UniProtKB/Swiss-Prot annotation:
It comes from the Archaea. The lineage of its organism: Archaea, Methanobacteriati, Methanobacteriota, Methanomada group, Methanococci. InterPro entries: Cupin_1, RmlC-like_jellyroll, RmlC_Cupin_sf. This is Uncharacterized protein MJ0764. It comes from Methanocaldococcus jannaschii (strain ATCC 43067 / DSM 2661 / JAL-1 / JCM 10045 / NBRC 100440) (Methanococcus jannaschii). Pfam families: Cupin_1 (PF00190). Transmembrane segments: none annotated.
Length: 116
């Protein structure tokens, strides 16, 4: 079999952070955040695409005002940008994080660096 299949949790009601794909070329994470949850504030460790498949994401980049993005949106975040992802408005926020190239190709740590 040439292809490789990756599975992710479906219909989660609690916080989920899954690193699904971690190859030399790309990282893909699956994240579910119930209302009121957020990811730690951190710097993007690659060129990031956030693919929102359920709910509404509140995203704050650097010192900008927060912006809301809804399911069906794909949001691009450049490399080495301070970011905060929150679920303020939805019962469940579900999204994928695609990092390409793999952070190691940019001499960045595999896991993002948290910031204040």
């Amino acid at each position: 079999m040439i292809e490789k299949v990756y599975e992710f949790k479906r219909d989660a009601k609690t916080k989920v952070v899954e690193k699904l794909v971690n190859t030399e070329h790309v990282q893909i994470n699956h994240i579910v955040l119930p209302r009121g949850e957020q990811m730690p504030k951190h710097y993007s460790n690659s060129y990031v695409h956030l693919i929102i498949i359920k709910g509404e994401m509140t995203l704050t980049l650097e010192d900008q005002e927060p912006h809301n993005y809804k399911e069906g949106n794909i949001v691009y975040v450049p490399f080495n940008v301070k970011m905060l992802i929150q679920n303020i408005n939805s019962d469940i926020l579900e999204f994928f994080v695609v990092k390409a190239p793999h952070p190691k190709k940019l001499n960045a740590p595999e896991d993002p660096i948290k910031c204040e």
